[in-house]
Structure formats: structure tokens, C-alpha cells
Amino acid sequence: MYNTDIVIIGSGPVGLFAVFQAGMLGMKCHVIDAQEVIGGQCITLYPEKHIYDIPAYPKIAAKELIKQLESQAAPFNPVYHLNQQATELNKHDDFFEIKTSKNTLIKSKVIIIAAGAGAFGPNKPPIANIEAFEGKSIFYFINDKSKFLGKNIVVAGGGDSAVDWAITLSEIANKIYLVHRRDKFTAATESVRQLRHIAETGKIELVTGYQLNNLDGHNSELRSVIVKDLQNNIRKLDANILLPFFGLKQDLGPLANWGFNVRLQHIEVDNYYYQTNIKGIYAIGDVAHYVGKLKLIITGFAEAACSLHHAYSRVFDGKALHFEYSTNKYEQKQ
């Protein structure tokens, strides 16, 4: 059995920043993640997607953000347990025992849940025979945007993923159609502004008021995407790629049975220290819910700092935390 101060469940950007924050406070960390590599959705779903709201970076690719966060945490020697889920929790007065799907046992004083969307998968559009085109002409996640060079692409959806990928791929695609059932998009205001600006050039065509209806192709190769509006008007869009972005199915998995207050696959926490209803267990990032919650990476970073400062006295048996600025702490570590 391993013995540590903090167990962090999830190795996305918020989980990695929590490793750094814990290290700055002198806490040892073990990290559990169901994926084979660290990085969460940033690596698994959109490694090449640019993120625009990280301080000091006008834009940064998701995979580069993870690389930098991993490097920032590395001096504190975290132990990663990858390709396994946290499955069982045993509570004791002043510590927890966690068991994983690979029978790894870890004893820890504090648990930080930074599981993002939990176990995730795409919400697929209800189109007949869609499976025949998946992986060849239809993709729900983008790991390598170069495969779309010179293609005619239908992007479907109205949120951040759909709008951001339409903008990004417009730089290399021959033509982009963005299909959305409404006239208004729910993506970030600046992203929508960029989208409409590019649409004026003709590089992106906004097909609003329409929904996906059918597919036309042969041997897994798409030739066109058929869309329909509320009046049953049909349009055939010449395209060899379809990218549906209708969000993710969220599933807390075994965590749902650990006794937390759960609301719509999110763990409820207080909005001071982000502690769950179980003392010593915190939830941060997208998995956490509280009044006023903003689902931003930078919000998760702040939650990591607050929760770990609050956890300090539990880890060190009631010892008061003497606050220091990061300059002094990190230079001492180096």
C-alpha cells in the first residue's frame, strides 16, 4: 500500500495544477487517472485546439498547456497511476484508503477530485447508418488536424467546440459549413465575433436553422451531408468530413457511489474551500458544482489553490499555515 498526503483523481489541467499547489505546500501527491496518458480532455479530445483564456498566453494549444503544467509540477515528484479508475473508498477518522481498478491501494489524508467530465463519450446525432462512416469520414474528437487539409467539412453544433474548430480548420480546409439549429451560438462572444468575420470572407458558410438529417456516401467515404429545417426544406452540403460537436455524456462512474451529494453528474461542494459533504474530500474543476460556478480552467486553478490551503491543517495535524509567496517557495525547491 502506498502512503501519501494527497490523492488527486484526474490529471487534466486542474488536477496537474493541484499537484503543483500541493507541492508548494510541502504535500506529497499520488494521481489516479483512467486514461493511459496524463492531460484529461486536453490530450484525449482536443490536443491541437487553441485555448485563449489562460493568463499570459494570447493562445496556447491544449497539448502545450498540459506539457507546461506537467513540467511545473515535476519538481515535486508526483506518482501517477494511469489507465485505472478510483473504484473503492474506505473512510477512517483521519485518513482514507482508496482502491483502484488495478487493485492499487493508497492511504491518504486528503482527496482532491479533479475528474473533469468523469468518464466521457460523445453525444452522437441520431442519423441512420452513422457508424459506417465513423473513424473515416465522421470524427467526434480531433487529434491531428492535418488530416483535414483541403477538405470540405461540415461542422455541426453551436457551442464552443463547434465554433472554435470551425475557426481553426478554416485555415486549412477548402470549405467549412457550420450547421446549427438556431441563429444564435452559445460559444464565447469573441469566438462568435471571429466566426462571423470569417463567414463574411466565404471561408465558412453558416447554415443556421438546420439540423443533420442524413448522409450520402459509399464505403465509409462521405460525399454529402443532408440537412433539414423546421419547414422540412432540404439542403445537400457537398462534404467529405462531418464533425458533430454536441457535447459529452458525463458519468462519474464509481465516484457516484462514494456518498457525495451529486447533482446532474456533478459533485456539490461549498463555495469557500470546495469541500464535499465528506470532510477531507474536495472537488475542483468541471466536476464540482456550487452557486456561481464558472466552468473555466482558470477557475479550476483558483479552486485548487483554495482547497489545498484549506487542507493543509488536516495533512499536518492541525498545524497553522504560514503563508509565503511562490517566489520564495519555488526557488527553495529548485
Swiss-Prot record:
Task: Paste the cofactor note.
Answer: Binds 1 FAD per subunit.
Q: Pfam families from the xrefs?
A: Pyr_redox_2
What InterPro entries does the record point to?
Answer: FAD/NAD-bd_sf, FAD/NAD-binding_dom, Fd--NADP_Rdtase_type_2, Ferredoxin-NADP_redctase_2
- Cofactor annotation: FAD
Organism from which the protein derives: Rickettsia prowazekii (strain Madrid E)
Protein name, as recorded: Ferredoxin--NADP reductase
Q: Which family does it belong to?
A: Belongs to the ferredoxin--NADP reductase type 2 family.
Q: Which GO terms describe its molecular function?
A: ferredoxin-NADP+ reductase activity; flavin adenine dinucleotide binding; NADP binding
List UniProt keywords, sorted A-Z. FAD, Flavoprotein, NADP, Oxidoreductase
Enzyme group, top EC level?
A: oxidoreductase
* Subunit-structure text: Homodimer.
Q: Where does FAD bind?
A: D33, Q41, Y46, A86, F120, D286, T327
The reaction(s) annotated as catalysed by this protein in its Swiss-Prot or TrEMBL entry are: 2 reduced [2Fe-2S]-[ferredoxin] + NADP(+) + H(+) = 2 oxidized [2Fe-2S]-[ferredoxin] + NADPH
Q: What is its EC number?
A: 1.18.1.2
